[in-house]
């Protein structure tokens, strides 16, 4: 894994740490003393995302190579049908009703039905009001808040929030009061154990949203700019069961962000 840029991180329910890089997928022990690289059943390309759903299924998406499910018994991966024209699913999410969603690179948002036959596996999602949700959009990350049950979509065009419906339509929510206080160039969103949203950005560290207060706060992480001389460029963010925020920075790699002290403990330390 050394010298490989990290694209996605997952701490699974069995205690393993999954790491996706630009060229491979790894499963590591909790202390990183051992790591296994998966090659035989997976394409050699960039890992877009790694996700574990409520049924403990682990889903991995690959750049232009589709979506795969991990088979724990065989310790291998199962490939799913191609999605859209480009077969480039970027993010996977399961909501509180166990509905799966897939955000693609350039082909919009889909509902995902893993148990259905080929033609029914993916269903494109559109907004009730035409054009409010881009059909050709790129969605990097998906999360659901605990207060309203809305889906939060991090895209190449900014942040979208939608209300689910029983059909393949969604209603977009006006969040101008939130987005006006945030940098609009985001990379990923996660939820902490208190129900707060954390959004990683390319230019300004991470943003924190507490919907109960409500509070919107930016954490610019000046130590990164001081060390690299460049913008923060947080490419991945993950909240573990201990409440720690794990980040991946373009130059410095993997680190744990401590909100209370505003400090980052880098993996190399």
Model-assigned labels for residue ranges:
Residues 1-269:
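Carboxylate-rich, polar loop motifs that coordinate divalent cations or form catalytic acidic clusters
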């Amino acid at each position: 894994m050394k010298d490989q840029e990290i694209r996605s991180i997952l701490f699974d329910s069995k205690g393993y740490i999954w790491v996706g890089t630009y060229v491979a997928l790894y499963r590591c022990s909790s202390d990183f003393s051992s790591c296994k690289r998966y090659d035989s059943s997976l394409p050699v390309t960039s890992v877009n995302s790694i996700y574990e759903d409520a049924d403990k299924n682990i889903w991995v998406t690959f750049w232009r190579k589709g979506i795969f499910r991990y088979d724990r018994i065989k310790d291998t991966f199962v490939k799913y049908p191609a999605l859209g024209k480009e077969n480039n699913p970027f993010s996977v999410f399961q909501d509180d009703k166990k509905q799966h969603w897939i955000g693609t690179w350039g082909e919009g948002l889909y509902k995902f039905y893993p148990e259905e036959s080929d033609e029914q596996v993916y269903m494109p999602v559109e907004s009730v009001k035409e054009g409010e949700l881009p059909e050709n959009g790129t969605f990097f990350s998906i999360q659901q808040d605990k207060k309203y049950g809305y889906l939060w979509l991090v895209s190449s065009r900014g942040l979208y929030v939608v209300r689910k419906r029983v059909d393949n339509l969604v209603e977009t929510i006006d969040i101008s009061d939130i987005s006006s206080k945030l940098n609009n160039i985001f990379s990923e969103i996660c939820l902490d154990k208190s129900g707060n949203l954390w959004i990683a950005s390319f230019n300004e560290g991470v943003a924190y949203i507490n919907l109960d207060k409500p509070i919107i706060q930016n954490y610019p992480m000046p130590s990164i700019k001081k060390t690299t001389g460049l913008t923060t460029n947080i490419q991945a963010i993950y909240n573990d069961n201990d409440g720690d925020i794990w980040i991946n920075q373009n130059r410095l790699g993997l680190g744990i962000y401590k909100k209370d002290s505003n400090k980052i403990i880098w993996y190399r330390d």
